[in-house]
Amino acid sequence: MRVVILLVSLIAVPYIMWQVMRIKGNKNITALENVQTGKSVSIFEGNDYALMDVEEYLVYCLPGIVDMGMDDEMLKTMAIIMRTSIYGEMYPELVYQSPYAEEGGETGLEVATGTDSAMYNLIRNGSCLVNEDSLTEVRYDKSELMDKWGGSYYTYMNRLCSAVLATKGQVICYEGMFIVPVYHQVSVGQTVSAQEIYGKEIPYLQGTDSKEDITCDGFSVTQVVDGLRIKKLCDLYCEQNPAAYVDYSKDASGTNEDSSSADDETKADNGRETTAGDKATEKGSADNVDKNTNKENEINILEATEHGFVKYVNVFGKTMTGQTFAGVMGLQSANFHIDQVDDGYRIITIGKGNSLGLSLWGGEAMARQGRTCDEIIKKYYANVDIVDMAQ
């Protein structure tokens, strides 16, 4: 009998403690449940539709983009970024300019020209209802977060709620319009412009120093892959995606002159010639650009941007974009260097992501140095304002 009682206790006590944590978690978000901004999201929950204020909605979306080891100021930064994204999706005509928009697409500049515009005031003072299906954010429900965080649920929810409440209504604007607040994990030592990555000038997406990123574990990753394996992976992918191999010849004249100038930089100070590894770490792949597309027995980079993001790569006589090649090979960014070694091809990858917009690693470093979320945002997004829509 004692053994039975002991077994029941071992099972029941943790269960009771777990239920207590669940109750505490629910109490923790009461303050946010009472926040009413007039901007609501229609969600499907419990076999029925319900309305959730955008501020509460943020709390359940943030776990998908933040690490709970982040500093509180970085959590605030990400709350402002995600709120800006949601507002931009609610009011797409008031997004200043998106790096993903088609050339010549609507920028919203004719709809509103600043913070005194009628449309801007409508957003601040009016109501809005959107269906969750029209938003790109991913929302976690309470049970999913409880399963994910376990006993840390209450602590983590409290931190997220605090970050959202501390920044309530704050969004990032350029000339009175919402920006598209793109971000990445780790830059190549500095962020780059939208012009470099997407070929279009976007004033709030300019390059800035982010030297803290080079201290990140995995900033530079080196792997050696057999050439036949690379060919097989690329061919298999292109069988499933026929457009993956592209015609580079139509862009070969004129567009590559800037990239080829990087070859002149292979000499370092004091006359020392840098090695492939040195140069890849310093400036991505720009040092080994070779515009010869007829090398059917080799893999070589055809064109790269100023900071080493590969635009086109030759794979045994066929051409792929650098982004496609990085995806096929599972590289952490399209900033890579390739050279042939005895065992195959050495691929050195720099950074994580496209180095556009906010660097999560760099922003976290700033937060731990005592910088505020406003300072972090204004470092990585040029000439922006943080506007309080709740006032």
Write out the residue ranges for each language-model feature:
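Conserved, single-site charged/polar hotspot
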Residues: 1-391
